Structure formats: structure tokens, C-alpha cells
Amino acid sequence: MAEITAALVKELRERTGAGMMECKKALVEANGDIELAIDNMRKSGQAKAAKKAGRIAAEGVIRVRIGSGFGVLVELNCETDFVAKDTGFLGLADEVADYALANKGTTIDTLATHFEDKRAALVAKIGENMTIRRVQYLEGDVIAQYLHGAKIGVLVAGSGSEEELRKVAMHVAASKPEFVNPEDVSAEVVEHERQIQIDIAINSGKPKEIAEKMVEGRMKKFTGEVSLTGQAFVMDPSVSVGDYLKSVNTSVTNFIRLEVGEGIEKVEEDFAAEVAKITGNNA
């Protein structure tokens, strides 16, 4: 039996909105597998929806650069928001982005090696760890970019109007689509969701045959919700992104979205407990 830690229960609560005891029970039944626990809770109705993305906890910045027929996003991380605004840290981020632009296709390992001396010197000066975490490129006939507060960066590739593609980039930043079109959703993802929806319907008392028919409509809604062109456009929710793009004679072939700290869990410290520990006052 896997150890069910308080941190694991806390993460499941945050991702499902369920109570502490329900989360602990689900984790025990799933032998500590949080993804399986989420699936089981959805099937039983305890969790109406579950976010699959990891918690965003690390600090840092995203930088974006546009070249000829391509764009690049880089992410640099640090430990605190204070350092994320430091001119030295921001200067390093800009240097890394400029290098990635000038050396198309460079890998994260190459960037880390090339800037190691500068990174180490800055760490020694500021006293906080820093990492060059990610670099991603996107090619296309037309490239548009959107940067939201240096925390979320988006590149969109397509054809037509760059101005319209930039609006779509803003939508991607806000709505977090996972695919371009509904038909792009992988068979594995579709089948996984279909089985969950069938179990939900059966658990509600529906016969299996009826449950399977009901799920077909839900699956169309699901693939639309996770795909860019199937989502309601944030600037005009009365139309889908796909319909809007058609109306402005523009199309999207691909996109990239990076958000600072995706998938990194930062240890949360109890400030009062830390002060008590330092002062020796545990009362």
C-alpha cells in the first residue's frame, strides 16, 4: 500500500474540490495513484471536473521572440516573485531569448551550458537558485505572439491576418486549449473520457445501452471544449473560434502556450510555524 501523504490529499482536494475525507478514501482505494483517484471520483460523482494540469507554483518569467517564419518561447525560473522582477534576472532572460532566436532550433541543454557561467554568477550575487527550464519553437507562414504579464506566453502559427492570429493567441492564453481542432484530439484521450462518461451514466441508473448512446453527444461537447477551434471565442462568446477565423479569412495550423511554473510544485511553508520554530516559541 502506497503512503497517502497530507500533501497528496491536499493536491487532490485542490484538483477536484472534494472534501478531505473523500479525497483520502479515494487515494486509499487507488493505492496512491492520484490520476486513478480522480477518474474514480468523477465516475462516482464526487468530482464533477478535474484539472489535469499540474499546480503552478514556481516563479519566473516567459520571454518571446519572433524571427522569419518562426517564433520561440523560453522560460526561466527562480524561487521568489521578488527575484522574478530583478533587473539582473530579467536581463539574463532577455539574453537567453535573444540567443534562442539567433540560434534557431537550439536545445535546452545547449542554452543551459552556454549561460551556465552567467547563471551561476547571478545566483551567487542574489543568493537564489535560477534555472533555464524550457525553450520551444513554432514555425509557420504567419506567426503571432501574445505575452501576458511575463507569466504566460503564446505563439500561434497560421495563414491570413497576423492581427487576427494575435487575438487568437490572447484566447489561447485565457482558455488553455489542448488541441487545434476537435478531430485532432487523440483516440486515447477520447476513449479515456468516453469510458468515464459511460461509467457516470451507468452509476446514475441508466442501462448500458442507453448510457453508450448518451455519451456520444457528450463526447462531441468534450472534443470541442479541449480544442481551439471548438471553443467559444473569448472576445465574442456567441461564436466559436473556428467560425470566427472563417469570418476573417484566417486559419491556425498550430500553437504553443507556456505558463511559468507549469507542473512544478513549490513547497508551501507555514509562516507562523516557521517564526515559532526560529524564536523557539511553540506555544
Curated annotation (Swiss-Prot):
**Family stated for the protein in its record:** Belongs to the EF-Ts family.
Which InterPro entries is this protein grouped with? EF-Ts_dimer_sf (IPR036402), Transl_elong_EFTs/EF1B (IPR001816), Transl_elong_EFTs/EF1B_dimer (IPR014039), Transl_elong_Ts_CS (IPR018101), UBA-like_sf (IPR009060)
| Pfam families named in the record | EF_TS
The reply on keyword Protein biosynthesis is yes
Tell me where it resides.
Cytoplasm
User: What's the stated role of this polypeptide?
Assistant: Associates with the EF-Tu.GDP complex and induces the exchange of GDP to GTP. It remains bound to the aminoacyl-tRNA.EF-Tu.GTP complex up to the GTP hydrolysis stage on the ribosome.
One GO CC term, this protein: cytoplasm
Q: Which domain of life is it from?
A: Bacteria
Provide the protein name: Elongation factor Ts
Query: What main location does UniProt list?
Result: cytoplasm
Q: What NCBIfam families is this protein classified in?
A: tsf (TIGR00116)
User: To which species is this protein native?
Assistant: Histophilus somni (strain 2336) (Haemophilus somnus)
Q: Which UniProt keywords apply?
A: Cytoplasm, Elongation factor, Protein biosynthesis
**What GO molecular-function term can you cite, just one?**
translation elongation factor activity
**Region Involved in Mg(2+) ion dislocation from EF-Tu: what ranges?**
80-83
Sorted alphabetically, which SUPFAM superfamilies does this protein's record hold?
Answer: Elongation factor Ts (EF-Ts), dimerisation domain (SSF54713), UBA-like (SSF46934)
